[in-house]
Design a protein with these regions (language model features):
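A short helix->loop->beta-strand "cap" motif at the edges of active sites that frequently abuts
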Residues: 31-35
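Structural beta-sheet core signal
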Residues: 38-40
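Acidic/histidine-rich helix-loop elements
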Residues: 9-11, 108
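Catalytic His-Asp segment of secreted/periplasmic serine-dependent ester chemistry enzymes
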Residues: 44-130
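N-terminal cationic-hydrophobic initiation segments that often serve targeting/anchoring roles
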Residues: 24-29, 79
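Charged helix-capping and loop-helix junction motifs
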Residues: 12-21
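Generic structural signal for well-ordered alpha-helices
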Residues: 20-25, 72
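Short, small-residue-biased leader/transition segments that mark boundaries at the very start
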Residues: 1-7
Length: 130
């Protein structure tokens, strides 16, 4: 899903969502009593100081925060339609400019442990559900 967004000429949102839905429906069919949690995609930061714009374009492909917001909205809608629980971790990782906080990221896409700690904090209420 997320990795496919990095390959600009291969990425099609419709295909991503279709595959995502298919996987969720297969899980529901095979494990009907299982509660499914669906988590948002993480934001990115394409504006880190010293980043070469051409390298960023090549590395990130179609993975922009605008695209991620739209995909997350579709994932949330799909989760609701399929009676899954959607967990938004996108917003808690953003800086004031709407990018993944620089202190959470290695190169704008992958996170350090402190970024994952924020995600874990957001997930804890769901992990502690009975």
């Amino acid at each position: 899903g997320g990795s496919e967004m990095c390959i600009r000429d291969r990425y099609k949102r419709e295909r991503l969502m279709s595959q995502y839905r298919k996987i969720l429906m297969q899980i529901q069919a095979r494990l009907p009593e299982t509660k499914i949690y669906v988590m948002s995609y993480y934001p990115v930061n394409r504006e880190l100081p010293g980043a070469d714009p051409e390298a960023v374009k090549a590395q990130f492909g179609a993975r922009t925060n605008a695209e991620l917001k739209e995909v997350n909205a579709e994932v949330e809608k799909m989760a609701e339609e399929l009676n899954c629980t959607y967990i938004n971790v996108f917003d808690c990782l953003l800086d004031e400019k709407g990018n993944l906080k620089a202190e959470y990221t290695i190169e704008g896409m992958h996170m350090y442990a402190n970024g994952y700690a924020v995600v874990l904090e957001k997930l804890m209420p769901y992990l502690l559900e009975e």
